[in-house]
Amino acid sequence: MARPSGRLGHNTRGTGSSSSGVLMVGPNFRVGKKIGCGNFGELRLGKNLYTNEYVAIKLEPMKSRAPQLHLEYRFYKQLGSGDGIPQVYYFGPCGKYNAMVLELLGPSLEDLFDLCDRTFSLKTVLMIAIQLISRMEYVHSKNLIYRDVKPENFLIGRPGNKTQQVIHIIDFGLAKEYIDPETKKHIPYREHKSLTGTARYMSINTHLGKEQSRRDDLEALGHMFMYFLRGSLPWQGLKADTLKERYQKIGDTKRATPIEVLCENFPEMATYLRYV
């Protein structure tokens, strides 16, 4: 998708709406209908009024208790224009919100999984794996760990777009620098960390409260690949009275499930999970 002509960066003019009452982000982007939501706030369809191109606009309340949009914007800038990294067109205020304008993408891997009756062939999963291991390698090369592997966070390009076959990685709100920018050293090993990520896919060490590193992203990818191959994972659907107890049960079941059982009939996936 071509880059809109508007400036990419912080909005020093503070525009949030026009005199006509249309909600705007910066001088270019008109805010449209809601197309999604999350812990950060909501996702809106937007339009670049100079180019007539559609965009995605993430809105986060300025009074958010745990603001992460500006950090996510910084991480996108750190990642640059690598394959499968969405373009970020703008960051700035929008009324009572902080707004980030991004390239509009197509459906997620979870959407496609549903469309395929929740069955992906081995060939399809291997094609996905090749792209996503490469994508994660690129993220790691920029001194970031992702920490939020789930099918909903991997999107193909829009239909008819030249990037339609490219799987993009989105949502860096939980990402973290694993190389200290001052010392240039790997962050220290720590324990008793709170859980970060999606319990279904996160690594066993994450359940154990250990500081995440690159291997945890790769293990989480392995769990996601097996989800696609099996249709579900052994630790799905566990009942518990509280979220904490449920996370504990998921972690216990992961540890109790041998890799050979998880990856039955897929020995190469077992080799991958043992390796990471």
UniProtKB/Swiss-Prot annotation:
Its EC number is 2.7.11.1. Residues 1-21 are annotated as: Disordered. Residues 12-21 have a biased composition (Polar residues). It is found in: Cytoplasm. One of its GO terms (biological process) is Wnt signaling pathway. Signal peptide: none annotated. Transmembrane segments: none annotated. Pfam families: Pkinase. Keywords: ATP-binding, Cytoplasm, Kinase, Nucleotide-binding, Serine/threonine-protein kinase, Transferase, Wnt signaling pathway. One of its GO terms (cellular component) is plasma membrane. It comes from the Eukaryota. It catalyses: L-seryl-[protein] + ATP = O-phospho-L-seryl-[protein] + ADP + H(+); L-threonyl-[protein] + ATP = O-phospho-L-threonyl-[protein] + ADP + H(+). It is an enzyme of class 2 (transferase). Its main location: cytoplasm. The active site is at residue 148. Monomer. Belongs to the protein kinase superfamily. CK1 Ser/Thr protein kinase family. Casein kinase I subfamily. Casein kinases are operationally defined by their preferential utilization of acidic proteins such as caseins as substrates. It can phosphorylate a large number of proteins. Participates in Wnt signaling. Triazolodiamine 1 is a commercial name for 5-amino-3-([4-(aminosulfonyl)phenyl]amino)-N-(2,6-difluorophenyl)-1H-1,2,4-triazole-1-carbothioamide. This is Casein kinase I isoform gamma-3. It comes from Bos taurus (Bovine). The lineage of its organism: Eukaryota, Metazoa, Chordata, Craniata, Vertebrata. The gene is CSNK1G3.
